[in-house]
Amino acid sequence: MRNEILDYFRKANGQFISGEQISRDLHVSRTAIWKHINILKERGYIFESSTRKGYRLIYAPNLLTPLEIDSALHTETFGRHVVYLSSTTSTNEEAKKIAREGAEEGTIVVAEEQTGGRGRLTRSFYCPFAKGIWFTLILRPKFFPLEASKCTLMAAVGVCRGIRRLGLQDAGIKWPNDILYHGKKLVGILTEMSASMEKIDYIIIGAGINTGMKKSEFPELFRESATSFLAEGIDVSRKDLLAAILAELEKEYEIAQTQGFDKVLEDWKALSLTLGQDVRVIMGEENYTGKAVDIDKDGCLLVDTGEKVERVIAGDVSIRPIDAPLPKR
């Protein structure tokens, strides 16, 4: 009922609504309405009240609370259960904990801030308070564990499509799952799982999307290599962006569950920024160059070195443009 009352005020666009009208339209007592409004006030919403006119909503907090997320969702299950945290070390770690305790599929863990955000190969990821979307989605798929690695590509497709829907049409995927915009990193994705030989217990998909950081607010180490919606001139609604991403993820997941991953791999190729490019493959102290020509049925990158086609497995390597400097050691 609280969500319905909040949605009712949103649709009023700042106009006063009498308690009698709300009571009549939502079939709830005026006392209950008053109690719900007081709870909303405690959660950061600001209402103006008038003896003759009733109430009007004049401020909603720019936070990814369950109420805010729910108001924007268009999914069946993804995001319908939200674990909300003001700050955490890692949403992935929180998600693993509740997944082990039986959290249902589609549950998301959302934090306003991550103090220990990380990506592939244990790289750090900058996650300041309310300047991005830091979340993890819990899945309990029915396909075999050998297929689990393809969820990384599925996640990249869903996130990239959601980002394109909110204005950054040129966003694309750097193999396997970074989302770039005009060569700069916009999103990091980290997929982890728990499984036996026969069955997947859970898969978690963690994503960090830069939304509200100015270029000057990025740490110097990332200033030239990272970007955000705001740095690209778009003041995006975080709840609308998260809702779009969850909707696209749910679509891709449904395809993977019912049709297999062939369509998902096609979707990934259509969004790829890596295929057709000259790349450097870095494997510990070793590195070689070649052209990224395709991905195989398992999502591995195929790199033509001129002498042979190498099969590159995600998680073992770093892929960089051929003219990029080697990482410092």
Q: Where do the language-model regions lie?
A:
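N-terminal lobe of the biotin/lipoate ligase/transferase fold
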Residues: 2-165, 329
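Short loop/edge segments at beta-strand edges and connector loops
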Residues: 86, 173-175
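Structural motif
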Residues: 81-82, 106-108, 133, 172, ...
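Long, positively charged amphipathic alpha-helical accessory segments at protein N-termini or as interdomain linkers
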Residues: 1-28, 38, 42-43, 147, ...
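A short, compositionally biased micro-patch
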Residues: 50, 128, 174, 295-296
